[in-house]
Amino acid sequence: MRTTISVIVETVSGATTGLERLLALFSAYEISVTFFISLGPGRDSGFFRRLTASNHLLAHADIFRVIEKAGHDLGMAPWDTSAWASMAAHADREWTRTQWKRALESWQDLFNVNPASHAATDFQVNPWLFEFEQQAGLAFASDVLGKSPFFPVMQSIESHCVQLPVTLAPLSVLRATNKFQESTLHEELFASSQKILPAGQHWRISADENPVLVEKMIVMWKGSSREFLTLPAVAEAAAESDIRQHKVGWDQQEDAGWAATQSLACADRRR
């Protein structure tokens, strides 16, 4: 069985303390993961602090270069993740284009290359996002929840930028149910991850996540002889398979809101 871990970096604390702890953890267990990075104002910054460059994640660019040197994969997250989380689902094309352009240009200025992938904050999407991802020539995107790689269709927009969905319930959702104690969350996640899926299981965490919980998951997966893959490796394998088009819908995530989700396959519409 295969497992993929991705990390989304959206806060100043995540870009500093959180990343340092996770990088040390992944190094100790010799695991390569995919980091999706925002370069705009941190979600943990208040309104006035968001206006100053020191509270933008770009101010901590050195740690992002350390990620690359450690052999991990880098992908892009929205520039203003707070705005994206609250507005993207109902935004028009112009708003989405402005947000996309700002994220893209910030990425190009820092890394001198185009991003290879993108992940949407809180699984909030709209049709225009899929259009811009295809236009940018991304190798893949990971914006939604789901079960298998697919080409997204939303309203009148069809994209051939493959989606690699997150398959395991986000920790924010599990916590919102109030059904699990923090000390047993890893047991629930591990049980869920036992289901065999075409491209394996994909777990996304925040850079602020408790490293003790992350280590418990790694130890349990290692103990069950899991193979750890990065998202680019999953995308490469998916490219050799028959990828279908699926509609993208919405699913209510307990008290954690609504998340974009892989829905029905489009009849007889494959790559």
Regions found by a protein language model. Name each.
Residues Q163-T177:
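Positively charged, amphipathic and often flexible ligand-engagement surfaces
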